[in-house]
A protein has these predicted regions:
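Conserved AMP-binding/adenylate-forming core of the ANL superfamily
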Residues: 19-87, 91-94, 112-117, 167-168
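Structural core segment of the AMP-binding/adenylate-forming
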Residues: 5-7, 71-72, 99-167
Length: 168
C-alpha cells in the first residue's frame, strides 16, 4: 500500500485526531506536567510552545500542495527539492509531492550555498520549496536556480522576488 494511501486511510479513520505535533524549542517547557495540566496552569504559553494538526488538516494541506504542483505542470517522475527546517509543514509538503507522483528530494538544512546548488543540479530538481531560513543562502544563486526551476517560498515574512509565495 503506497504511503499516500495510508494518509488517506488515517484521515478517514482518525480525521479529527492529532496527526502531527511541533514543539517550539525556543520556548522550552520548564514544568514537569501533563499537557492537560500545563494548559490549566498556563493556557497562553502552551499554545505558543506546541502546535498540532489533525489528520484531516494534514491531508488537506498535502492535497493543496499536490494541486499547486499539478497546476504548475509538475508530472510524475519529476523532482521536487525540499529545503526546510524540521517543522510542522514539512510532512504535508512531502506528501503533496508524493501524491503528484513526483519524487521528493529532501535537502539537508545544513547545506551552504554551494552545496545547495550542487545538489539541485546533481538531482536535476524541477522545483525547490524553501523556507525563510534559507533566503540568505539561496539569494546569491537565485538567478541560476530559478532560470529553469519553479521556486516556492514557504514561511513568514516577505517572499523574495525570484520565488512564488506558498504559505498555507
Amino acid at each position: 500500500m503506497p504511503i499516500t494511501d495510508i494518509l488517506e486511510k488515517n484521515c478517514r479513520l482518525y480525521g479529527d485526531d492529532v496527526a502531527l505535533v511541533e514543539i517550539n524549542p525556543e520556548m522550552p517547557e520548564t514544568k514537569r506536567t501533563t499537557w492537560k495540566e500545563f494548559d490549566l496552569i498556563e493556557p497562553s504559553r502552551a499554545a505558543y510552545y506546541r502546535r498540532e494538526i489533525t489528520w484531516n488538516v494534514f491531508n488537506e494541506k498535502a492535497n493543496r500542495f499536490a494541486n499547486l504542483l499539478i497546476e504548475r505542470g509538475i508530472k510524475k517522475g519529476e523532482k521536487v527539492g525540499i529545503l526546510l527546517m524540521n517543522c510542522l509543514e514539512w510532512l504535508p509538503i512531502y506528501f503533496g509531492v508524493l501524491k503528484t507522483g513526483a519524487l521528493a528530494v529532501p535537502f539537508n538544512f545544513r547545506y551552504d550555498t554551494d552545496e545547495i546548488k550542487y545538489c539541485a543540479d546533481l538531482a536535476e530538481v524541477d522545483v525547490i520549496v524553501f523556507g525563510s531560513n534559507f533566503i540568505g543562502r539561496l539569494e546569491p544563486i537565485a538567478d541560476e536556480l530559478s532560470r529553469n526551476r519553479l521556486m516556492f517560498y514557504f514561511g513568514e515574512g516577505g517572499c523574495p522576488a525570484w520565488a512564488e509565495d506558498y504559505s498555507s
